Every structure is written in C-alpha cells, then in structure tokens.
C-alpha cells in the first residue's frame, strides 16, 4: 500500500501525523509519499530529514487550497506502483496498530469494491443528531434552504484500488478532491462503501481544524471559538500528542 500525505505549512501537525503513522505501522508493508505544496518553511525542512518517506516538492503558482491539495494527490498517483493507495491529511492521526489490516479487510471484502472511506470522521453525540434533525425539519417547514451535499470519500481517509483510480480523471476536476472521481467510479458500477465514523474512530482520528491549535497564528473564526479550541485540546491530550511530538526516535 502507498500512503499519500499532502503537506502545506503545518510543521507540528505533520510531525504528529507521520510519527503516529510510524508508531502504529509496520513500515515494511507501506510506502509513504509526502507531497509538499511549496511550503518554503520549517515543515518542508523537517520532511527533508526523514529517510523513511519519499518527499516530492512541487510549485503551486496561482493555485488555491482545494486545487493545490487535489493536484498534489494526482502528482503522487503518477508515482504509485502498489495495488492500493491511501490518501490522508496531516491532521489524520493513527491510534491503533490494527488500522492497516482493518482497511485492507474492508476493501478486499468484495471484488467489485473500488474504494472505502469516510465522509466525516467524527463521532456525533446522539442528542446533537436528534436536535439537528429537528432543525432540518423546521427549516423545511419554513421553506428555508437546506444544504444537502452528496457524500463522497473525503481525503482525510480514503483507500482506493490504484487501478480503479486510473480509470478516472484523477482527484482534480474543478471540485474538491475526489468528488468527481467518486461519481465516475460509482457510474462504472463499482461499490464504494462508507466506513461508519464510530468504527473508523477506533483506528484513527481526524482532528478537524487542528491547525488552529498547533499553529495559533492562523486567523479564522474557528480559531477564536473557545469551545472548539477546548474540544481539540482535549482530543490532543487523549492522543498523547505531546509525547509523540517529543519522541524524535519516531523519525529514525
């Protein structure tokens, strides 16, 4: 399996992601491709020191965030020579040494499965789900617009059969990474089962907006939300983030 990780200016988060991957993986079973999106900072300097990954540095002149991310994935796919390819974010953190066998088992469950993945890797409390449904019902009653996006595999965790990916236009197609690819594979008759958040969370976590925690200079409404910051800090504590960031041996 090849693991693709795009990087852009997130030193500590990139360290946490890659070190957790190293900590919970038999690296003789995977190849790790990190595509740096013209960071020109300490994060790419750090990546250059890692002998256990393959680092590709690309220029991103005129590219916005979503395009930059998707094009990085497409560049990486040109180098993939394994049967399976997993794409993750730098805020995807492994927490179990069984994650690899878990995902392989999912994608090999049937021959017509082209990929498995996640829409949102977050466990939502039942009460919050209940009130969200009430809110949606009321909005429909009042004739207000409801955002009803079609789900696809988001790139914080998406495992594909490499040959299936090559039957599409790739990750970049003027939309978020993987949107059109998911639709093309589905139209070709492939199965694309989603992994429930509650199940996937036993193997890895996706730290939504963690950049605002580890890189407090980022300016965003989310970074100024004390409740979300407290929640993320608690999650980082549960993942023993400080211990992992302090363990330089995981880079060797």
Which role fits each region the language model picked out?
Residues 60-79:
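Glycine-rich, basic loop-to-helix element that forms the pyrophosphate-binding segment
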Residues 115-130:
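Short beta-strand-to-loop element that shapes/binds the nucleotide-sugar donor at the catalytic cleft/hinge
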């Amino acid at each position: 399996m090849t693991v693709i990780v795009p990087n852009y200016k997130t030193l500590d988060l990139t360290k946490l992601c890659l070190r957790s991957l190293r900590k919970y993986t038999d690296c003789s079973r995977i190849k790790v491709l990190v595509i740096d999106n013209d960071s020109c900072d300490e994060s790419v300097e750090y990546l250059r020191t890692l002998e256990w990954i393959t680092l590709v540095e690309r220029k991103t002149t005129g590219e916005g965030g979503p395009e930059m991310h998707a094009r990085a994935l497409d560049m990486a796919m040109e180098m993939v020579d394994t049967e399976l390819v997993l794409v993750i974010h730098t805020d995807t953190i492994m927490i179990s040494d069984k994650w690899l066998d878990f995902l392989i088992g999912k994608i090999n469950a049937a021959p017509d499965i082209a990929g498995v993945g996640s829409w949102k890797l977050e466990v939502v409390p039942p009460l919050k789900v209940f009130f969200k449904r009430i809110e949606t019902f009321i909005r429909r009653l009042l004739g207000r617009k409801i955002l009803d996006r079609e789900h696809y595999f988001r790139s914080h965790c998406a495992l594909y059969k490499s040959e299936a990916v090559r039957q599409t236009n790739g990750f970049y197609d003027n939309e978020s990474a993987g949107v059109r690819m998911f639709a093309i594979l589905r139209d070709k008759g492939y199965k694309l089962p989603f992994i429930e958040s509650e199940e996937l969370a036993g193997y890895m976590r996706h730290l939504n907006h963690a950049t605002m925690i580890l890189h407090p200079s980022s300016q965003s409404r989310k970074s100024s939300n004390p409740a979300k910051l407290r929640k993320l800090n608690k999650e980082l504590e549960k993942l023993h983030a400080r211990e992992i960031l302090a363990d330089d041996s995981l880079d060797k």
